Amino acid sequence: MLLALAQWLQGDASFLRLFTYLTFRAVMATITALGIGLVCGPWVIRKLTQMKVGQAVRKDGPQTHLVKSGTPTMGGVLILIGIAVATLLWGDLTNRFIWIVMLVTFGFGVIGWVDDYRKVVHKDPRGMSSREKYFWQSVIGLFAAVYLAFSVSEANNVRVFDLFMAWVRSGLSMGLPARADLMLPFLKSISYPLGVWGFIVLTYFVIVGASNAVNLTDGLDGLVIMPVVLVGASLGVFAYVMGSAVYSKYLLFPHIPGAGELLIFCSAMGGAGLAFLWYNTHPAQVFMGDVGALALGGALGTVAVIVRQEIVLFIMGGIFVAETLSVMLQVSWFKYTKKRYGEGRRLLKMAPLHHHFELSGWKETQVVVRFWIITLMLCLFGLTTLKLR
């Protein structure tokens, strides 16, 4: 919004040229989202408390968590407000990548909000059924996947609908250019061609998988938000490089016109996340809830797809991956042993993984900070793929 205004008035006030610089707008998006979160946080927490949307705590979990019962949840709304305002203020609203990421983020946020609302307001412990939740996630994920298959493959001024119709007329056999290939880290001249169908399938699983992985990680005070901020900031760097014809050529990456604008979104997400951490740090005054976790995970997955860094997301989001695998292995092993021995057995003391470490003697803050450190290391490792190719 401010970019369009600055471009319109630039002839009358040359200092407004500053608003056209991507890095300046990224910094301002961070500050804006951070400021909104810090200022609006107490009001949002009061409103959530008045709505009596207190978090229910599992009685079979760590006993130290029982004191958290009643802490307001659905605080992810605060994050989404910061992201929306900062992105709309400082982003280029003619950029289609901005809008598709916003659509996925807020679409998944609505799913999470409905799930949270049913749990804490209607007192339905199940919330949305797994089938219902995955159905709506799949609807949004598949729409984004089809849209991005033709958005990423061409320049920003080509109509996506025209490309889609060309694919249909080709008998669904039209290929995609090299910039839409699956990029392999550390290999500068080797990529895996996906084709339209491969791109859609991969994108669907990345977006929906990332959303649910972040949601599973959200279980301790401050645990998930800092990894989201770190991974989001790292993806913002990739977006800046891929969107720049100069830097992408120098670093031997395919140039994706318009992708650089995602730096604004990632910066807004980082600022909003840090503001939320102010109130979510131990002992938490508010929890994120599904409304925040599903939305942020979907956002990370979508940005990673646009900048063609799905494998790097898997690396940098190693904590999310480990938490998800711990749940899958725990459930699978329990079912297998129950069928084979007549008694279900556990691989871990409790899943997800962070609860296993708590029950093994780690304090909550130790688990959180150590997971932060691991994520920082993984993000730095992921960023090395920019140069080590």
From Swiss-Prot:
InterPro entries: Glycosyl_transferase_4, PNAcMuramoyl-5peptid_Trfase, PNAcMuramoyl-5peptid_Trfase_CS. It holds the Pfam family Glycos_transf_4. CDD domains: GT_MraY. It is an enzyme of class 2 (transferase). It comes from the Bacteria. Its cofactor is Mg(2+). Keywords: Cell cycle, Cell division, Cell inner membrane, Cell membrane, Cell shape, Cell wall biogenesis/degradation, Magnesium, Membrane, Metal-binding, Peptidoglycan synthesis, Transferase, Transmembrane, Transmembrane helix. Belongs to the glycosyltransferase 4 family. MraY subfamily. Catalyzes the initial step of the lipid cycle reactions in the biosynthesis of the cell wall peptidoglycan: transfers peptidoglycan precursor phospho-MurNAc-pentapeptide from UDP-MurNAc-pentapeptide onto the lipid carrier undecaprenyl phosphate, yielding undecaprenyl-pyrophosphoryl-MurNAc-pentapeptide, known as lipid I. This is Phospho-N-acetylmuramoyl-pentapeptide-transferase. The gene is mraY.
